[in-house]
Amino acid sequence: MYSLISEISERCRLAAEKRGKDTSWLSCIYSLRDELAEYWAAKDDARETSLEAIRAAEKIQDDTEFIDAYEKNLHNTVADELADVLIVAATWNASAAANNAENFKPERDVEVMLASGAISFICGQIGGPRDVEMLRCMVNLKMRFNELRKD
C-alpha cells in the first residue's frame, strides 16, 4: 500500500492544487472525514461496482466519453470512495514532503504518521488480491477523472 501511495502522491497533490483544493494538513484531515463518510454511505447503500465496469472504463480513450461513463457507472460507488480515501492520504503525504523538502524524513513526520491511519483503514477494507487490483485500477481511473474535471 505504501508503495502505491509513494508512486501516486505527487500526482494526487498536483491534481488537487490544479483544481484549487487546499492540500494543507488541516484540509486533508477534513477531506478524510468527508471521504470516510461518503465511503460508509456507499457501503451502507451497497453501491458496488464490478471489475468489468472498471475494465470497460479503462478502455475509453475519449475524455468526454470517459467522464460521462465514470459519472454514470463508477462515481460514488464503494470502490470510488475507497479510492478517494487513498488519494487524500497520498496527497497528504506529498504535501508533508513538499513542506519539509530538504529535511523530510517520512518515518519522523507527524503528518505521515497521521495519514498512515487512513492507509491502515484502507488495508482493513481489502479482502484479497482482487480487492487490491480493483483499488489500483480505481485510483488510476479516479485520478484521470480528477485531472479532467472542472471543479
Mark where each language-model region is:
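Flexible "arm" and connector segments at domain edges
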Residues: 1-151
